[in-house]
């Protein structure tokens, strides 16, 4: 899937982006763009099917982005890439830790559509720990559409954007996308966006991953996921199950190794569906 000698176009560490060490991370991976060797016919099939599904499945609800959530549910060919061991091994070598596919059905893969009419993606930090961006189509010419990464603490950048203040140009790293090149980013806690596209378009396959050893390092909050997928609630139960079966045991194992205190066994509660009714407090 990926050759032994990979052409790396651009690489930057997490510490170089943020400006200091961070504890809430899976490794010091920041971002790396490399030439991939994914089957071009497979990618073309995914692109074609995504375009056929766009009017029915793509939404534009959050971060000014038009995309198909959980795209592998509708385009089974995506699963070939998600589960390819050679791909996972290669990406893990970039990250410095063993990676696994992100488990939630609505979040594991997306196909994004970016253009002047479809939007791009606004400034944000990722909820998922690691993301691979694989361009399926880039118009020629295209004006805009670069990955822009804020160099500095994400809270500083977010505060400026929330106050409608411009980010200093010296603090923005721009990485253009190219066909045949994939970008792997550990964008959890890293402020970034896609530069608005003024002319042309880009279609991108987005495959999300996490640390196999530390699946609890994750910033996806319920409200944030719901901002994209408020049309169903199945993913809420998936997330709950993953917490008890994967994240909590891994976290207790990590804490036991850190503190030397034996971790208690995880007691899996009964998880029922549908979701219970919650009374919202109206006075304080």
Predicted segments, located by residue:
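Short loop segments at secondary-structure junctions
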Residues: 37-38, 136-140, 210-213
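Signature of the catalytic double-stranded beta-helix
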Residues: 26, 32-107, 275-278, 282-284
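Catalytic core of non-heme Fe(II) oxygenases with the double-stranded beta-helix
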Residues: 112-179, 188
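Hydrophobic residues positioned within well-ordered beta-strands of beta-sheet architectures
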Residues: 34, 130-132, 203-205
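A structural signal for well-ordered alpha-helical scaffolds and beta->alpha junctions
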Residues: 84-88, 129, 187, 199-202
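Conserved double-stranded beta-helix
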Residues: 154-284
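Mitochondrial intermembrane space
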Residues: 2-24
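Soluble, non-transmembrane catalytic domains of enzymes that act on hydrophobic metabolites at membranes
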Residues: 53-54, 118, 190-195
């Amino acid at each position: 899937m990926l050759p032994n000698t990979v052409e790396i176009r651009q690489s930057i560490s997490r510490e170089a982006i943020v400006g200091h060490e961070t504890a809430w991370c899976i490794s010091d991976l920041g971002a790396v763009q490399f030439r991939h060797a994914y089957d071009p016919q497979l990618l073309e099939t995914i692109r074609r099917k995504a375009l056929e599904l766009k009017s029915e499945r793509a939404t534009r609800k959050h971060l000014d982005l038009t995309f198909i959530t959980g795209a592998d549910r509708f385009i089974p060919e995506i699963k070939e890439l998600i589960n390819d061991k050679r791909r996972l091994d290669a990406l893990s070598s970039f990250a410095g830790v063993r990676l696994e596919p992100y488990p939630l059905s609505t979040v594991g893969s997306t196909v994004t559509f970016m253009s002047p009419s479809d939007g791009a993606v606004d400034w944000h930090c990722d909820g998922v720990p690691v993301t691979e961006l694989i361009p399926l189509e880039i118009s020629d010419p295209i004006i805009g559409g670069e990955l822009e990464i804020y160099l500095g603490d994400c809270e500083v950048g977010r505060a400026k954007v929330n106050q409608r203040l411009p980010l200093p140009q010296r603090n923005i790293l721009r990485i253009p996308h190219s066909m045949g090149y994939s970008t792997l980013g550990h964008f959890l806690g890293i402020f970034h966006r896609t530069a608005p596209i003024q002319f042309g378009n880009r279609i991108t396959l987005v495959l999300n991953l996490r640390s196999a050893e530390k699946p609890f390092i994750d910033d996806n909050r319920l409200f944030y996921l719901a901002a994209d997928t408020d049309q169903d609630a199945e993913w809420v139960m998936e997330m709950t199950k993953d917490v008890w079966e994967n994240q909590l045991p891994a976290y207790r194992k990590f804490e036991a190794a850190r503190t030397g205190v034996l971790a208690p066994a995880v007691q899996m509660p009964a998880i029922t569906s549908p979701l219970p009714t919650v009374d919202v407090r109206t006075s304080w």
